[in-house]
Amino acid sequence: MSKLAEIEALLFVAGEDGLKVHQLAEILSLPPTGVIQSLEKLAEQYEVNPDSSLTLLETSKTYKLVTKPEFAEILRAYSRAPINQSLSRAALETLSIIAYKQPITRVEIDDIRGVNSSGALAKLLAFELVREDGKKEVIGRPNLYVTTDYFLDYMGINHLDELPIVEETELVAEESQLFIERTDIDENQ
């Protein structure tokens, strides 16, 4: 497996947070100059490949995989699509965690789920089931996420206190199942 592929995989998993050169260097046991050379090569590969929708973005010394600007219109159309398509299990787990733990950061969601939740969170934001609600007052000031009024409407409740009470250990598995059942009911109506 090439270092280039490893960097690409790490950037993919890092999602919107991206990674800094020193983080990549530490994870891959490479010198920072080697990481920079690999990042430059990866960026060039994306730019010359007309069949790739991805590009490498560097902001504030943080590298991220993002879609090329020419795909903005189709991505906008996707984000505006009605929620008649089912949410993935990852999105449902993420939504249930936010509903019960809000306000909560993406990293806190990741810690509960045990995997990166960037993609699921992006979908929930696009569907307007959750929204950003300020920043947590810790180093890095990460965004805090909460559910929206649309979430309440979608779930058929008026207040968050109408959500079923669950034990902490049951939160991810049981509550995501409740959301799955709710979306199944909606699809069958």
From Swiss-Prot:
Function as written in the Swiss-Prot or TrEMBL entry: Participates in chromosomal partition during cell division. May act via the formation of a condensin-like complex containing Smc and ScpA that pull DNA away from mid-cell into both cell halves.
Designated name of the protein: Segregation and condensation protein B
GO cellular component, one term: cytoplasm
Gene coding for it: scpB
PANTHER family from the UniProt entry: SEGREGATION AND CONDENSATION PROTEIN B
Record flagged with keyword Cytoplasm: yes
Native species: Streptococcus sanguinis (strain SK36)
Subunit structure: Homodimer. Homodimerization may be required to stabilize the binding of ScpA to the Smc head domains. Component of a cohesin-like complex composed of ScpA, ScpB and the Smc homodimer, in which ScpA and ScpB bind to the head domain of Smc. The presence of the three proteins is required for the association of the complex with DNA.
The family this protein is said to belong to: Belongs to the ScpB family.
Database matches in Gene3D superfamilies: Winged helix-like DNA-binding domain superfamily/Winged helix DNA-binding domain
Keyword field: Cell cycle, Cell division, Chromosome partition, Cytoplasm
GO terms (BP aspect): cell division; chromosome separation; DNA replication
Chief place where the protein resides: cytoplasm
Localization, UniProt: Cytoplasm
